[in-house]
Regions:
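Conserved beta-strand position repeated across blades of beta-propeller domains
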Residues: 41-43, 87, 148, 218
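Short, conserved, GDST-rich strand-edge loop motifs in beta-rich repeat architectures
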Residues: 1-3, 97-118, 159-182, 229-242
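Multi-bladed beta-propeller domains
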Residues: 14-35, 64-82, 124-143, 189-213, ...
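Beta-rich catalytic cores
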Residues: 36-38, 82-84, 119, 143-145, ...
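Residue-level detector of Asp-centered blade-edge/turn motifs that repeat once per structural unit
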Residues: 44-46, 90-91, 151-152, 221-222
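Loop/turn-rich, solvent-exposed surfaces of beta-rich toroidal or solenoidal domains
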Residues: 211-247
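Hydrophobic beta-strand positions that form the internal "hydrophobic ladder"
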Residues: 49-50, 95, 153-156, 226
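A short loop-to-beta-strand structural motif that recurs across blades of beta-propeller domains
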Residues: 8-10, 60-62, 122-124, 185-187, ...
Length: 257
């Protein structure tokens, strides 16, 4: 479970399956000063524009654009964290990120042995040319996460869970005992490229009203279909045995497994 220290980001040639290493996690790791890399993402499958996160030792977000590589740190007092889950705009030099306070538990009796959950999260937009950050959604008593653009770049989809944690006992403790009450639904906001503004939040799938939790929205290349993961609760469905993939026809708003 803790072998993340040996992670590498590789690329494979589809013509002959030759592999080469883009980045080796052990290059900057040493005993007691480990590094963790992941969340690599490209702009519309373009290898000339890539980003990945490096955490812990020498942490930051590595952005490679048009042959130039740089490390940035978006952590600021006004943000919950540095950027976490990324989503490149299809053709503009913009990356939507969630910022998250994340925890995890290990269970012995529950059939889902690992539980990863947030106690707070927002969605932001990072301008890679001007190094500026603007909020997209940071509502009180809501946790927004997993941004994803439509193929035309006119909509930003994301998940949001409405829940109010107790301040008297602390968010971490309350979330730890009520993690099965955290249920995400899928929203989207219209994006205006000319003035870089977002519209009001539009509810696309009210999973919470159906006692479910929907995460990781992805839009088909034609723009007509939404694929998402859905389970009984929470945001990290990779650990949930009951979770499955669903598809929604955005023209009829009907969903099916």
């Amino acid at each position: 479970y803790v072998t993340y220290e040996k992670l590498t980001i590789n690329q494979r040639c589809l013509e002959n399956f030759d592999e080469s290493v883009i980045y080796d996690n052990m290059l900057c790791s040493s005993e007691g000063k480990e590094q963790c890399i992941n969340c690599h993402s490209y702009q519309n499958y373009n290898p000339d524009k890539m980003q990945f996160h490096a955490r812990q030792q020498n942490g930051g977000t590595i952005i490679a654009m048009d042959g130039k590589v740089r490390k940035i740190n978006m952590k600021h007092d006004s943000l919950l964290s540095a950027g976490v889950y990324p989503a490149w705009h299809p053709h503009l030099n913009l990356i939507a990120y969630s910022t998250n306070h994340t925890m995890q538990n290990f269970h012995t009796r529950d059939k889902n042995k690992v539980e990863v959950f947030d106690t707070d999260s927002d969605v932001i937009l990072f301008d890679t040319e001007n190094n500026t950050v603007m909020p997209v959604s940071r509502l009180k008593d809501e946790m927004e996460s997993f941004p994803s653009w439509s193929p035309d770049g006119k909509w930003l989809y994301y998940c949001s869970a409405k829940i109010e944690f107790s301040d008297s006992i602390g968010k971490e403790y309350d979330a730890n005992t009520r993690y099965k009450d955290i249920k995400y639904s899928i929203y989207r906001k219209a994006f205006n490229e000319k003035d870089m503004t977002f519209g009001e939040a539009e509810l696309i799938w009210d999973a919470a009203a159906n006692n479910k939790s929907a995460t990781l929205p992805r839009i088909s290349p034609c723009g007509n279909y939404l694929v998402y993961a859905q389970g009984a609760y929470g945001c990290f469905h990779v650990w949930h045995n009951d979770a499955d993939l669903y598809i929604m026809d955005l023209r009829t708003m009907e969903s099916k497994p």
